[in-house]
Amino acid sequence: MELRSYQWEVIMPALEGKNIIIWLPTGAGKTRAAAYVAKRHLETVDGAKVVVLVNRVHLVTQHGEEFRRMLDGRWTVTTLSGDMGPRAGFGHLARCHDLLICTAELLQMALTSPEEEEHVELTVFSLIVVDECHHTHKDTVYNVIMSQYLELKLQRAQPLPQVLGLTASPGTGGASKLDGAINHVLQLCANLDTWCIMSPQNCCPQLQEHSQQPCKQYNLCHRRSQDPFGDLLKKLMDQIHDHLEMPELSRKFGTQMYEQQVVKLSEAAALAGLQEQRVYALHLRRYNDALLIHDTVRAVDALAALQDFYHREHVTKTQILCAERRLLALFDDRKNELAHLATHGPENPKLEMLEKILQRQFSSSNSPRGIIFTRTRQSAHSLLLWLQQQQGLQTVDIRAQLLIGAGNSSQSTHMTQRDQQEVIQKFQDGTLNLLVATSVAEEGLDIPHCNVVVRYGLLTNEISMVQARGRARADQSVYAFVATEGSRELKRELINEALETLMEQAVAAVQKMDQAEYQAKIRDLQQAALTKRAAQAAQRENQRQQFPVEHVQLLCINCMVAVGHGSDLRKVEGTHHVNVNPNFSNYYNVSRDPVVINKVFKDWKPGGVISCRNCGEVWGLQMIYKSVKLPVLKVRSMLLETPQGRIQAKKWSRVPFSVPDFDFLQHCAENLSDLSLD
């Protein structure tokens, strides 16, 4: 597989063993260039071992195909992702193969694992390829791994692996001025220990020939001239505000700012023990969510979300507060009127605009293929339903499916990793010709024949814009931006265009820096980053020692009943927090049906949902770990009563006491009744 001249130009320092970032537009062949570097590395370096890191599960398979084609069967290659189920340990596979392609999370888990079969040292590898390397910042997994690399460098550990970063969009890091953007690019280079960012200087004409950009069009529409459904939702929210008696609370309903405000109110009310105020805030957030859905898709979708919430409240809550009874009655009294307005109100102008785009694109081109990007899984589901029901699109050959995240935050809206791979394959072979996607499909997805990309009412940064645009790779393809005139989304897209230019200027400025000045700057940034990380680690350790575990009580976030102590908690696999006190089972119920996670874990499987026996609040799920049943708790389902007052932690890693690791053998010896014989 021969490389193009611009690919040769950007990889030359990497072939000499230098750490570089390859900066090429989407679709210009970064992966192929990296595969060639890996091949030459395996040919020329004694005992070479390569790891390719990706940040999306579906890219593991895609990159596996590209690297195998390049390596032509001469070296052993394996791919690893979280959905593989039972497998040999990561460390064992690393020792037995020449090249591994895996998600960064798996490598990070292996670096910290105490098990010999699983554990691996970073220095086992002689080359690390970091795909979509612009994610190497702050506390991302990429940056956690590279921080360990920099610590080894500071200790003068030898030999260190070579690092090859790949990106189409380094970004500006939120900077709006050139100096800030340059500092962001330099920080990215420091994080990846980069000798130079490489982009074509002498072969630009050939690059332009092979990476033509789609035609961009702004498809803008007016707001609904009348909105009786939205008006009624706001009227109901006004009534809830009247009960709250908090005149200082903003009433800018249907905005992200309002959402942030009521989230803060619910958290503050929980800490203060104001149960009714917390309930009002939680319900106001659901109404606000409905307004946001209504703005994005249809009124019937917004109503369905509200109905789903109130149905769950009816089914799960076993203790009803006066405020909850009032709120349930308020919705029940007006739900028929809402249903009538939802089905008889005006169409969303953004959907009318989207219909025109799809009719034009899918009627005029041969074998069209497109992707609609939207913000949330909820809106993706709603858009797919609209596509299937819209009369005006029934005469057009549209075969659509979802492509959304594999997370498990909502059983009704997530996709499994296997589902993702199947959908991508069907899209690539033409069985499907339209994807309704969230950001999971923005990066790396290689669909050469995709000729239309629609960004539907999105408020994102310049990296997201560049990545989504890059999915349109066919000749004469179209990139359509759908938004309301004068909206925040439109203003942000225009800012993104300016930031893309700023990013290009910043990279050019870094490339032109004197090498000695550049290297000195990189060293300073690396030292500062390691010092900051060490200080943060020390601060977290101090925080974990703030209170003795036995002096911290666990309270249900909803009914405030005390259900355990910090000393009851243990960590499984370093992340899952379980309560091992046998008496804890007196405080919760377990659903009969297990939680559905279509992903096979190495040592555990999910059991049922666990919820507060007193009030019905969902706390988490039951984990069956090596045949032992353990209740896994969500940190946001618990309040912590400390000697200095109540707190609500956003992450278990931020709680003010130390949680020891789970000891399987000790637990089995002490709690034989927990064993599952299923």
UniProtKB/Swiss-Prot annotation:
Residues 350-514 form the Helicase C-terminal domain. It catalyses: ATP + H2O = ADP + phosphate + H(+). Keywords: Antiviral defense, ATP-binding, Coiled coil, Cytoplasm, Helicase, Host-virus interaction, Hydrolase, Immunity, Innate immunity, Metal-binding, Nucleotide-binding, RNA-binding, Zinc. GO terms for biological process: antiviral innate immune response; cytoplasmic pattern recognition receptor signaling pathway; negative regulation of innate immune response; negative regulation of MDA-5 signaling pathway; negative regulation of RIG-I signaling pathway; negative regulation of type I interferon production; positive regulation of MDA-5 signaling pathway; positive regulation of RIG-I signaling pathway. Zn(2+) binds at C556, C559, C612, C615. InterPro entries: Helicase/UvrB_N, Helicase_ATP-bd, Helicase_C-like, P-loop_NTPase, RIG-I-like_C, RLR_C_sf, RLR_CTR, RLR_Helicase. Signal peptide: none annotated. PROSITE patterns: HELICASE_ATP_BIND_1, HELICASE_CTER, RLR_CTR. A motif (DECH box) lies at residues 131-134. Residues 489-546 form a coiled coil. GO terms for molecular function: ATP binding; ATP hydrolysis activity; DNA binding; double-stranded RNA binding; RNA helicase activity; single-stranded RNA binding; zinc ion binding. Induction: By interferon (IFN), virus infection, or intracellular dsRNA. CDD domains: DEXHc_RLR-3 (cd18075), LGP2_C (cd15806), MDA5_ID (cd12090), SF2_C_dicer (cd18802). It comes from the Eukaryota. The keyword Cell division does not apply. The RLR CTR domain is capable of inhibiting dimerization and signaling of RIGI and also facilitates binding of dsRNA. Belongs to the helicase family. RLR subfamily. This is ATP-dependent RNA helicase DHX58. It comes from Homo sapiens. The lineage of its organism: Eukaryota, Metazoa, Chordata, Craniata, Vertebrata.
